[in-house]
Amino acid sequence: RIPHYNFSQYILERLPADCTTKTDVVEQILSTTRCHPYYTQQLAALVWDFLTYKKLDAAEVVEQAIATLVRTHDLDFERIWLNFNKTDRSVLMGLVSNVQLASNRRLPTSTVYSSVKRLMQSGYVIKLDAFEVEDPFFARWIRQRQA
């Protein structure tokens, strides 16, 4: 991960000059991506395109860019999702809903943590302050499926 301050300065310098709420836009980008370089690059590039070419309102541009990324990767996410077993899906749904892993009473604790270990080894889950789905756009896609 790149330090928040360094990343925010880098993005701020590159957003279009006519964007009046640059700081808010950058904060929304970095809070969504948690300063992960790959996901930040994806989101920031799309935000830049929307601000520069589509002249979208800065107040809504990040949310629209996220929705576009989720929609763009829908088939990829669906394919990934279908390859998970029922336990992995349950764990992922719990993680995106901020449910504590230990409080999942539908599955034995050892099963939950075996699933987390498997998902971490596959690169879908990481542990920062807590376990979470690494790809913020995949996490959003999972949340939308639950709704």
Residues of each region from the PLM?
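Conserved nucleotide-binding/hydrolysis micro-motifs of P-loop NTPases
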Residues: I2-H4, V47, F138
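Winged-helix-like regulatory helical subdomains adjacent to P-loop NTPase cores
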Residues: C19-T23, T33-C35, Y39-S110
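Membrane-interface alpha helices of multi-pass inner-membrane proteins
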Residues: Q28-T32
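Short amphipathic alpha-helical interaction segments
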Residues: R106-S122, I126-L128, E132
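Short, amphipathic alpha-helical interaction segments positioned at domain boundaries
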Residues: F138-A147
